[in-house]
Every structure is written in structure tokens, then in C-alpha cells.
Amino acid sequence: EWVPVEFEMIPYVESIDAIARFFLKEIRPEFELYVSPINLDPVAPLMPISTPVGYATELAEATGRFYTQGMPEDTNALNEGVFNNADFMTQVAMVHTEIRNQFDYVLNEFRGGFLFYYFGNLDQVSHMMWRAMDPEHPAHDPIADAPYANAVIDRYVDADDFIGETLGKLPENTTLVVMSDHGFTSW
């Protein structure tokens, strides 16, 4: 769940509304609490974060608060060892649900013209988990990666299912373009 946080800029005059997620990793033997990067609160952003200006607030009110900065899958947490594979994939699933809910809202509100929607989930999982399915990858760990050997393939299957669902919701004579900014291959 998102936790609203407030940063006082000028005491009693000005503050910044933000949000963060907290993930209790461990209590003992060492206390470990992960805090997501601080995000502008889309319900009350300090500055415009969407066009039109009020759209982020509308989307947040319709679907819930959401990530407003960086890569929500938080690849840096995995790279730096803050997340293990399981933590990362839990984060991926949470972000995926958030994005899907937003897309459903956007698609249901769409009345014509051009709609572009970016799903970064597959890209981020491919960057971070390709090693799990590639025994020749220099970062491959046969024990730690074994449960995640299908992580990339599972994202493709999910994307394919999602495209099918989307096609079923589109009116006749609508063109759907699915594209990628790049592909992936072994190390």
C-alpha cells in the first residue's frame, strides 16, 4: 500500500505531499525495511506530472495512487542486492497490477483518436531476469535463478493474453499496434 508522506519546506507555510511504499524484509536477526523511492503524490502533485495537468489526479482517484518516477519495478534494488529475485518479482507483480488497472480505466474512457500506452514490465523483467533462463550468462546462478527460469517467458505469455483481451474490447475498424523498442538475446 502507498503511504502518504509530507515534507515540510517552510514551517507552517509550505509542504510537499509525496508517497512511498514500505516493505518489511526482516525483523531478526537484523531489522531490514525497504522504502521505495519517494514519488510525487498523483492525488496532489507539487507540479504538473501529466497532460492535461489534472489527469494524474483523475487517474489516481479512479485507480489508486501509482508510481510517478523512474522505473517502478525498481531494478536498482535488485542490482544493489536490496531485493533478491523473489522480492523483485513481487514488485513486478504489484506494478503489473497497477498498470493493468490503469490501462483498463484509460481504455474504457477512450472515445476515439489515438491512444498510446507503455508497458515497461516485460522490458524490465527481460533486462533483469534473462540470466535466469540462460546458463551461459555470466551472472547466472543455477540455484538462485532456477525458480525464475521462466520469468521472461511468463511475461510474454501474459502480454499475449493481455493483447487478446484488449482486442476483444476494441470497436471494429480499430488498429492495434504492438511494438518494442528493442529485442533481447543471450549475453
Task: Give, region by region, the residue ranges found by the protein language model.
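His/Asp/Glu-rich, glycine-adjacent segments
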Residues: 1-142
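Metal-dependent active-site segment of extracytoplasmic phospho-/sulfohydrolases and closely related
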Residues: 154-187
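Extracellular loop and loop/strand-boundary signature of outer-membrane beta-barrel proteins
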Residues: 147-152
